[in-house]
């Protein structure tokens, strides 16, 4: 069954030429023109990569510091103990502690966007695997969310550090700013993100690595970029 689209969506969708692959600047400029929502929409990137996540060496995940942040306020839970609790809170964590939060999560509490933990807490957090894992919230050293320097990690993520991972279909979705950002800032964020994606290309990845690259607003139509152009300009 087709998804019902509102009148405003259908109007802005006409701005996007079907089948066309846009260059970076052109696509981002067009995306800003597709705003229809009353709230400040997020500019999102959707990638389809030439990887097979069933192979461990092709499970792409990592972090990138977007030069201008995502524009989103990230609610952070720091799972740690002792003096690190105060350090995490001072760095901007919304919640910090250990057993009390682990117990709350087991009871269904999920009022946070990101979990950062010190390594000593991981055996305890292990029992939250089914809850956090399915939502992509499980702390992991590769995504910079398991670290002894929890204060620095909290500070970086609050400033705009972005964690990403490929899903089982070989896709990655990530926010790169808000629609009301200056176009140059969105472009710089996009390039920083793509630079990291390209650097993480597995040696075992066969054929075309960047299969599709598209950008859109939260409620808007997708605008496809030319993967060949993205691959040349960035990296």
Swiss-Prot record:
UniProt entry keywords in alphabetical sequence: Repressor, Ribonucleoprotein, Ribosomal protein, RNA-binding, rRNA-binding, Translation regulation, tRNA-binding
The record ties this protein, via SUPFAM superfamilies, to: Ribosomal protein L1
- CDD domains documented for this protein: Ribosomal_L1 (cd00403)
Report if keyword Ribonucleoprotein is assigned: yes
Pfam families for this protein: Ribosomal_L1
Q: Does the keyword Ubl conjugation apply?
A: no
Which cellular component, as a GO term, is one annotated location? large ribosomal subunit
* Any one biological process term the GO annotation gives: translation
GO MF, any single term: tRNA binding
Into which family does the record put it?
Belongs to the universal ribosomal protein uL1 family.
- Quaternary structure and interacting proteins, as annotated: Part of the 50S ribosomal subunit.
Q: What does this protein do?
A: Binds directly to 23S rRNA. The L1 stalk is quite mobile in the ribosome, and is involved in E site tRNA release.
Q: What is this protein called?
A: Large ribosomal subunit protein uL1
Q: Which organism is it from?
A: Fusobacterium nucleatum subsp. nucleatum (strain ATCC 25586 / DSM 15643 / BCRC 10681 / CIP 101130 / JCM 8532 / KCTC 2640 / LMG 13131 / VPI 4355)
Gene field: rplA
């Amino acid at each position: 069954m087709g998804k019902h689209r509102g009148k405003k969506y259908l109007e802005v969708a006409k701005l996007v030429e079907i089948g066309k692959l846009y260059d970076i600047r052109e696509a981002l400029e067009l995306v800003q023109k597709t705003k229809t929502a009353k709230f400040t929409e997020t500019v999102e990137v959707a990638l389809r990569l030439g990887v097979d996540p069933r192979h461990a060496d092709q499970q792409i995940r990592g972090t990138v510091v977007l030069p201008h942040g995502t524009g989103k306020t990230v609610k952070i839970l720091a799972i740690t103990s002792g003096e690190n609790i105060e350090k995490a809170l001072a760095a901007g964590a919304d919640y910090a502690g250990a057993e009390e939060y682990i117990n709350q999560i087991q009871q269904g509490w999920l009022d946070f966007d990101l979990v950062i933990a010190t390594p000593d807490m991981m055996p305890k957090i292990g029992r939250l695997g089914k809850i956090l894992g399915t939502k992509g919230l499980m702390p992991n050293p590769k995504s910079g969310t398991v670290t002894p320097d929890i204060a620095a990690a909290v500070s970086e993520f609050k400033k705009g550090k972005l964690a990403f991972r490929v899903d089982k279909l070989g896709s990655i979705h990530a926010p790169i700013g808000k629609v009301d950002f200056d176009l140059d800032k969105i472009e710089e964020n996009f390039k920083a993100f793509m630079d990291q994606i390209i650097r993480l290309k597995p040696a075992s990845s066969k054929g075309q690595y960047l299969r599709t690259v598209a950008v859109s607003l939260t409620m808007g139509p997708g605008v496809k970029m030319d993967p060949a152009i993205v691959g040349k300009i960035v990296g």
